[in-house]
Amino acid sequence: MCNVHAQQGSAQEAPPPGELLLIDKPLDWTSFDVVAKVRNTYRKCGSKRKVGHCGTLDPKATGLLIVATGRKTKEISQLEQLDKVYDGVIKLGAITASHDTETPEEQLCDVAHLSEAELHAVAATFIGNRLQQPPMHSAAWHNGRRLYEHARKGEVIRERKAREIVVHRFTITNVALPFVSFELHVSKGAYIRVIADEFGAALGVGGYLAALRRTAIGEWQLTNALSVNDTIEQIHNNASKGALCGTASTIHPAT
């Protein structure tokens, strides 16, 4: 999902040059929180520009978020087509309504009988094309309302429109039951929370996403990202030098 928040100048103003910022989204921040922070920082520095992001991260997820500004917001639709890579942890032996830590655990059960071989074998069955329904606790639309709005009213929409995704890689990296660490390489639009829920269901014990960190979007790597605070500091430093584009976290797609 991509979102662009416009800061409109006068009709005579030329659109400002833009940048693509690699930001490490903190825990419990929404992607919109990060966009708002960047947008407000530019405003305080006297620069009016569009600011948007590509690839929404849930509040309980951390990691790579690409924030586009100025003319670079035109590249968001291209960037959102890229594959994503994640590191995460699934907790087995329980489920939650949101498929992550946002809601309480339910249906607890024992997982001591599970073997590592079984975990690897089930993970392998997820590789390839598959249809995935968006979770009820998500921003997907249904009849003009977000699914999470229905969920907050206790409504369950069973005819949620499924989308086709591709799981390129699902690797179990560590097992310390009930926790299973993994790496996932998926196509655009994949809900990792749903994969965690389906993984637990396939094992017959239930499961939910206990932690998630995005490490790559296409060729863009988390290792090159800045924290929110460091990004804000870069913007202020560049403003003081009279150069608001070209920060250390700016990236330029290959041409």
Swiss-Prot record:
Keywords: Isomerase, tRNA processing
Reactions catalysed according to its record: uridine(55) in tRNA = pseudouridine(55) in tRNA
InterPro entries per record: PsdUridine_synth_cat_dom_sf (IPR020103), PsdUridine_synth_N (IPR002501), tRNA_psdUridine_synth_TruB (IPR014780)
Pfam family membership, one: TruB_N
A single BP term in Gene Ontology: tRNA pseudouridine synthesis
Listed GO MF terms: RNA binding; tRNA pseudouridine(55) synthase activity
EC number assigned by the record: 5.4.99.25
Active site: 58
Protein purpose: Responsible for synthesis of pseudouridine from uracil-55 in the psi GC loop of transfer RNAs.
Family the entry assigns: Belongs to the pseudouridine synthase TruB family. Type 1 subfamily.
UniProt xrefs under NCBIfam families: TruB (TIGR00431)
Official protein name in the record: tRNA pseudouridine synthase B
